[in-house]
Every structure is written in structure tokens, then in C-alpha cells.
């Protein structure tokens, strides 16, 4: 009988312990940092899409309240080979090219540096190994130009690759920028969309990196690379839907741009067409409909400045592309 009581007591203790464990929920975890292996997304973004929005086009001068730029690392001009309904729908009445020219060398830091600073890599000197913070006094970025023109404006940069937020975009106490770095692309999209909804930023840059990783892994233009572009197309739709939901669409210039392409062998940095040709797409009320444009990646600051109604900086070496804005159909 004594042994039976011990056995019953042990069973009761075990049952109690199991019930307590079942009631304890694990604490939620933040996305992995740059030194950790990021968790693989278990779900795709929920987008009621493909996203469609029809602008009331005008040939009058429009001063935009917002500019949102999506940078897709390593996508080059390969979107034409993938099924990307959001990209197609959003820019169906906008201006787009899949053969814009990137900077030389066709690597991430030189190219994103030229896009954000408005000068060529041989001038700004930023490489993939650059990591130290810069104050931007030598070559100010579009963030400094916009921040000084609109001191109370909300500025944000959400990037997978942290060097963009350290070595390219300024780090200054007098230039408050909401910077988020080292997140997987899925979180760049979800957290970026949330920020847009809650803050309606004047200028925001979002950087997606999965396409470049896929290109290095399986080759640029490979099935895996193109599948990754299709996934990023859903992120593009997610961000654009946030712009619509925030009531910003009619006052936002929306840009999608890539930095470089690559070879079937998974390389880039050279001057072949596969490495140098990139996507540039833009839409807004004053963007000429169904227009194919040509530009260099370092012309982006001129586009941003014109859209927001501010002067270009003297350090910039960039021009407005011909036929982009309806009020200046011949360019500037």
C-alpha cells in the first residue's frame, strides 16, 4: 500500500508539471541580427493583389509630399524574365526602363552610393569594404538635402545590408533618420509598411537583398534568381499597399530601382550588359504615362529634388531624364 501511494504521488506530480509547462508560452523573439542566421519566413506577405491604383494624371507641376524608393539589390534588368504582377500594375501608367545604366564598378556600395549621393564611384570613393560612418560634408546624400530643406520631415532608411546606413547615408545628430539595418527582406517589407502607415515619411529608402544572394548562389537569371524576384514583387506590392492605405498615393513619387545585375556564373562588378543594365521604374500623378526612359543611377537625386520642389545640391552630378515629368516633357 505504501508503494502504491508513492506511485500515485509521483504520477500526480508529473501531471502537474506537464500542465504547468503547457501553460507557459515562450517569449516572442526579434528577427536575427547580422551575426546570426536569419530564420526562414514561414509565410508570404498578405497582399490583396496584385495591387492596382489609377492616378489622375496631370501635365501641371506637382510638388510631392513624399518620395518612397525601393532598392532591389542584384536584380539588374531581370524582372522582365519573371512573373511580377505588382511591378507591372503599379507602373503600367508610369515611366519604366529595364536598361538604365548603373555605376562602374557594378557592385553594391559603389552603385547605391552613386544613387544616394548623385556622383560617380570615382568621386565618392565608397566601396563594399567601406564601413565607417560619414558626416556627408564632402558629398551630401539625398537625405541631407531633404532633411535641410524640411527640418521637421520624417526620414527613414530600412536596409538589409547595414553598410548603406553607415558608410553611405550620413550619421549626424542634426539629421535625424530612422535607420533599421540587418533585417531579412520579409521584415524590411512588413516593418517598412508599418512605418509608412504610422509616419507618412517625407523620404524613405527600403533595400531588399535576397535577389543578390540568389544570383550569387545559383547565377543571375537562374530559376532561383527569378523566383526570388517574384517574391520581392510581393514585397513591392506590400509597400505600395501601405502607401495607398496611408492616404499617400496621390502625393507620393514611388520609385523601384536596382543597383546591378550579374552573370550566369554568379558574378558582378564588370561592364557587361547583364551586369550594367538595371531596372528603374517611377510613378506619380505628374509622371508621363506609358513612357520608357533612359537614365544613369546617379540621376536619382535630381529626380527626388525636383519631385519635392527643392534645389539640387552643388556637389551632385545628375540630370532629370527626358520625358519623365509631364510638365517638362523634353526633360531638363
Predicted feature locations:
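Short, structured active-site-proximal loop/turn typified by the sulfatase FGly-forming signature C/S-X-P-X-R
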Residues: 77-111
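Catalytic-site neighborhoods of secreted/periplasmic enzymes
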Residues: 124-128, 134-185
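Bacterial signal peptide processing site
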Residues: 24-26
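Substrate-binding rim/cap in mid-to-C-terminal beta-strand-loop elements of soluble/periplasmic
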Residues: 110-118, 270-311
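A short beta-strand-to-alpha-helix junction
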Residues: 62, 104, 132-139, 226-230, ...
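Active-site His/acidic residue clusters
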Residues: 165-175, 193-234, 238
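Metal-dependent active-site segment of extracytoplasmic phospho-/sulfohydrolases and closely related
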Residues: 68-69, 86-87, 231-271, 304
Amino acid at each position: 500500500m505504501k508503494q502504491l501511494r508513492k506511485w500515485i504521488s509521483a504520477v500526480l506530480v508529473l501531471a502537474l508539471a506537464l500542465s504547468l509547462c503547457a501553460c507557459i508560452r515562450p517569449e516572442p523573439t526579434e528577427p536575427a541580427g547580422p551575426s546570426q542566421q536569419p530564420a526562414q519566413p514561414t509565410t508570404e506577405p498578405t497582399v490583396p493583389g496584385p495591387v492596382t491604383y489609377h492616378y489622375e494624371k496631370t501635365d501641371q507641376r506637382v510638388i510631392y509630399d513624399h518620395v518612397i524608393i525601393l532598392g532591389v539589390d542584384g536584380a539588374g534588368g531581370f524582372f522582365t524574365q519573371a512573373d511580377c504582377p505588382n511591378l507591372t500594375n503599379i507602373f503600367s501608367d508610369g515611366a519604366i526602363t529595364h536598361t538604365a545604366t548603373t555605376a562602374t564598378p557594378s557592385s553594391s556600395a559603389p552603385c547605391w552610393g552613386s544613387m544616394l549621393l548623385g556622383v560617380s564611384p570615382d568621386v565618392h570613393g565608397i566601396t563594399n569594404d567601406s564601413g565607417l560612418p560619414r558626416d556627408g560634408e564632402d558629398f551630401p546624400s539625398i537625405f541631407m538635402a531633404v532633411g535641410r530643406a524640411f527640418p521637421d520631415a520624417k526620414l527613414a532608411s530600412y536596409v538589409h545590408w547595414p553598410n548603406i546606413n553607415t558608410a553611405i547615408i550620413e550619421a549626424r545628430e542634426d539629421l535625424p533618420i530612422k535607420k533599421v539595418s540587418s533585417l531579412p527582406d520579409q521584415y524590411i517589407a512588413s516593418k517598412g509598411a508599418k512605418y509608412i502607415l504610422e509616419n507618412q515619411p517625407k523620404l524613405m529608402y527600403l533595400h531588399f537583398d535576397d535577389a543578390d544572394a540568389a544570383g550569387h548562389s545559383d547565377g543571375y537569371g537562374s530559376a532561383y534568381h527569378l523566383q526570388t524576384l517574384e517574391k520581392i514583387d510581393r514585397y513591392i506590392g506590400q509597400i505600395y499597399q501601405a502607401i495607398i492605405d496611408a492616404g499617400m498615393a496621390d502625393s507620393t513619387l514611388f520609385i523601384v530601382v536596382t543597383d546591378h545585375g550579374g552573370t550566369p556564373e554568379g558574378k558582378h562588378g564588370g561592364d557587361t550588359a547583364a551586369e550594367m543594365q538595371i531596372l528603374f521604374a517611377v510613378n506619380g500623378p505628374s509622371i508621363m504615362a506609358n513612357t520608357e526612359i533612359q537614365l544613369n543611377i546617379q540621376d536619382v537625386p535630381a529626380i527626388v529634388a525636383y519631385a519635392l520642389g527643392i534645389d539640387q545640391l552643388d556637389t551632385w552630378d545628375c540630370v532629370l531624364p527626358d520625358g519623365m515629368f509631364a510638365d517638362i516633357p523634353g526633360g531638363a
